[in-house]
From Swiss-Prot:
The keyword Ribosomal protein applies. Belongs to the bacterial ribosomal protein bL20 family. InterPro entries: Ribosomal_bL20, RIBOSOMAL_L20_CS, Ribosomal_protein_bL20_C. It comes from Salinibacter ruber (strain DSM 13855 / M31). Keywords: Ribonucleoprotein, Ribosomal protein, RNA-binding, rRNA-binding. CDD domains: Ribosomal_L20. One of its GO terms (biological process) is ribosomal large subunit assembly. It holds the Pfam family Ribosomal_L20. Binds directly to 23S ribosomal RNA and is necessary for the in vitro assembly process of the 50S ribosomal subunit. It is not involved in the protein synthesizing functions of that subunit. This is Large ribosomal subunit protein bL20. PROSITE patterns: RIBOSOMAL_L20. GO terms for cellular component: ribonucleoprotein complex; ribosome. The gene is rplT.
């Protein structure tokens, strides 16, 4: 009796990996063994970077708010300390966006918070 290999499932599994490896360079996109390793590593990077993305954006927002508040002779930590005590309720993302795209509105916020 011949050996059963379940060829359709094997082909589907390999084709799925090779499709995910499209756009990779050289053997990474053509050879199953190499492509499988490259795809797994790519998925690991994607998982890690989805989490790092949140940290990086928070750092960017803090940097932008800090730069904008220092133009008004206030440090970031002083501003945020007073901001939490104030009646305003905006997150860092919105504050950073205002600091970059609408400096006049941000100046009013700084004045309101620091009074």
């Amino acid at each position: 009796m011949p050996r059963a290999t379940n060829k359709p499932a094997t082909r589907r599994r390999r084709k799925k990996i090779l499709n995910k490896a499209k756009g990779y360079w050289g053997r990474r996109s053509k050879v199953y063994k190499v492509a499988k390793h490259a795809v797994e590593k790519g998925l690991q990077y994607a998982y890690r970077d989805r989490r790092q993305k949140k940290r990086r954006f928070r750092r960017l927002w803090i940097t932008r708010i800090n730069a904008a508040t220092r133009q008004h002779d206030v440090s970031y930590s002083q501003f945020m300390g007073q901001y939490r005590k104030s009646d305003l309720d905006m997150n860092r993302k919105v504050l950073a966006d205002l600091a970059v795209h609408d400096p006049d509105a941000f100046e009013q916020i700084v004045d309101h918070v620091m009074e």
